[in-house]
């Protein structure tokens, strides 16, 4: 074990280097093997994870809570109904208090600026469980899943069909760091925000008007719901706009013969993806969901203990 010399947070995918991701992805493989072999591994014995939820979730809560338990620690769940966060307590004050009573903090919230402010005033590592702008833990799990099934992602093509949301922007950061092509296709009005795409990332991003063309030669096709949390009022308008951006068998046929399909879930069959695709032989969504558990264990272990 080589404990970190200073506090490190995980707020965006770009917070870690290529070399750190190589370690984390290999460590995820090792921790998953321990889990499958019922091997006890408690490097975080008596450590406490605070989980702060301003946005509800099944997979995020379950994977973090089970993960810290499997590493020998325990979790405390907080939401805006159960804490002063929902009653106007300044973020800076909450960060000071919560970080003095826990060892690591995961936050699932709205604006990225909230978690950035929290981390600035935290005395312990902070992990982004999801914000409107980024979802790094999910993309880390997706990449680990791809590697499990198909080997290194470097030099491959990942196609995103759908909204320019937190997943898409996180994939863009990952493409630059890990060295793969990112194809993006969305209807007019739902395109990428240029402000959210760093100049250094642009060579890795290729935008297509036609989703079929975007899928051409892809090694991975992935998508998400058309209406993310907080945009429910736009649901009907989005359904009309995204009609041609449902991932279909025809799109998968344009991809590589052994292309994978992923979706971060929950999914709406018949909207962003055909049932035949998500339930088909190219889909790895259940492995993808499980792997949130293993990559987040590797992440928490790394932030608190360093390398083994």
Curated annotation (Swiss-Prot):
GO terms for molecular function: amino acid binding; ornithine carbamoyltransferase activity. GO terms for biological process: arginine biosynthetic process via ornithine; citrulline biosynthetic process; L-arginine biosynthetic process. It is an enzyme of class 2 (transferase). It comes from the Bacteria. Its EC number is 2.1.3.3. PROSITE patterns: CARBAMOYLTRANSFERASE. This is Ornithine carbamoyltransferase.
